[in-house]
């Protein structure tokens, strides 16, 4: 099996056309009505996957439940084994989780696009994934850009976790409320980081576009309508900052309530290269289930793209792919890799992971006394963390064949 995969990767690499042979500023994917057009003039229908959990850890992809955001996972690891070993783990995790082999494999499966979720802290000196200064966000993205260029894949940069938190749930790695919309300081940082990213990649045709904020403004809050009214103005502010340095790349705008509500948008003509992005988990796999997305796409005459979909049966996914292709909504399934199934590449759960790591993550540690009482066996806990990092390496993961087939990437 492993030889077959490596052979396929090699043949994919050798057979890939030089999609990105030129770097002139005219060589970018562009918006044309409801379609995306490649530099060669051909239509681009997005098909691919998300590199979730790599630069934006989420608890369930580690097999954790109550410890479910990046800062919670990091705190749990530091409490268990100390900050220095936590930093060692995070570096190994980042080095192993996504590599050149992963990107070539994704291409070989038939994908043309990858969505890369990331945390804004990767572009600050805030404590994040083992670093407290000189964060490595650009280094990590530069690597993926190079691998995507080699494979012939487009890349969408998705700020999954924004300053202050844009969602109000674990997925934004914040503090339970979308403070981004009430903090001028956070908004300035949000726009500044996007401008820095755009300035670095302004001449890079591998980049399809910049997705400003993942799943902003959850439905939990009594003042959600007031928050929703602030979404479009903040998007415009960020677009303005980006356009000061990058006039070319597409900018992707997600709706509120898990990227499913678009009624708060009233102006879609303020920039010539914007598109919208929706998400869908659950519900019937029918055209009627995404009628609101289709209607908004038709109203704006701009592309609509399903940035996240998945975590369902193979049959449901295959049927939804047929629907999305029929209505011209491209897609990237979530996620590419995690513990267990429902992904392209499964990570083997280390032996004793549940009884030691998961159990510790659910043990009360709200006081220093509880913290001391919960302290695990150091050698055992450290070995399990490093085994998880090793198991996440491409050569140690397992392709989920039926899942991959359900994505319709080669059809």
PLM feature segments, named:
Residues 1-3, 20, 39, 321-324:
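A general structural signal for short secondary-structure junctions and capping/turn motifs
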Residues 22-35:
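Short acidic, Pro/Gly- and aromatic-enriched capping/linker segments at domain boundaries
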Residues 23-25, 40-45, 270:
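A short, polar/charged loop/turn motif at coil->beta-strand junctions and beta-hairpin connectors
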Residues 316-411:
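Aromatic-rich peripheral "rim/lid" segments of glycoside hydrolase catalytic domains that contact
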């Amino acid at each position: 099996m492993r030889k077959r995969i490596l052979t396929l990767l090699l043949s994919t690499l050798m057979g890939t056309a030089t999609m990105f042979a030129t770097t002139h500023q005219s060589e970018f994917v562009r918006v044309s009505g409801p379609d995306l057009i490649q530099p060669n003039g051909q239509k681009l229908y997005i098909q691919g996957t998300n590199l979730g959990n790599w630069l934006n850890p989420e608890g369930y992809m580690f097999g954790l439940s109550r410890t479910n955001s990046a800062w919670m996972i990091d705190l749990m690891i530091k409490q268990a084994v100390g900050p220095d070993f936590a930093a060692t783990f995070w570096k190994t995790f980042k080095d192993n989780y996504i590599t050149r082999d992963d990107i070539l494999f994704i291409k070989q499966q038939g994908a043309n696009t990858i969505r890369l979720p990331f945390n804004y802290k990767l572009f600050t000196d805030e404590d994040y994934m083992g670093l407290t200064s000189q964060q490595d966000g650009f280094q990590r993205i530069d690597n993926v850009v190079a691998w995507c260029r080699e494979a012939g894949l487009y890349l969408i940069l998705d700020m999954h976790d924004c300053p202050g938190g844009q969602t109000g749930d674990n997925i934004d790695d914040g503090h339970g409320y979308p403070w981004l919309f009430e903090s001028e300081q956070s908004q300035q940082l949000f726009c500044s980081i996007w401008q820095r990213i755009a300035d670095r990649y302004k001449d890079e045709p591998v980049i399809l576009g910049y997705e400003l904020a993942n799943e902003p403004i959850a439905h939990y809050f009594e003042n959600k309508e007031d928050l929703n009214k602030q979404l479009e103005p903040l998007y415009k502010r960020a677009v303005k900052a980006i356009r000061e340095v990058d006039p070319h790349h597409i900018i992707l705008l997600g709706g509120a309530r898990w990227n499913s509500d678009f009624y708060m948008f009233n102006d879609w003509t303020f920039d010539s290269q914007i598109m919208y992005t929706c998400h869908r988990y659950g519900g019937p796999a029918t055209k009627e289930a995404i009628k609101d997305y289709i209607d908004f796409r038709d109203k704006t005459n701009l592309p609509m793209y399903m940035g996240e979909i998945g975590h369902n049966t193979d049959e449901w996914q295959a049927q939804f792919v047929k629907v999305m292709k029929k209505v011209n909504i491209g897609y990237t399934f979530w996620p590419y890799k995690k513990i267990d199934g429902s992904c392209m590449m499964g990570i083997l759960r280390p032996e004793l992971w549940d009884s030691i790591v998961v159990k510790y993550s659910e043990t009360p540690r709200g006081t220093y006394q509880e913290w001391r009482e919960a302290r695990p066996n150091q050698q055992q806990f450290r070995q399990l963390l490093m085994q998880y990092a090793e198991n996440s390496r491409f050569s140690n993961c397992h392709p989920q064949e039926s899942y991959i087939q359900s994505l319709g990437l080669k059809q």
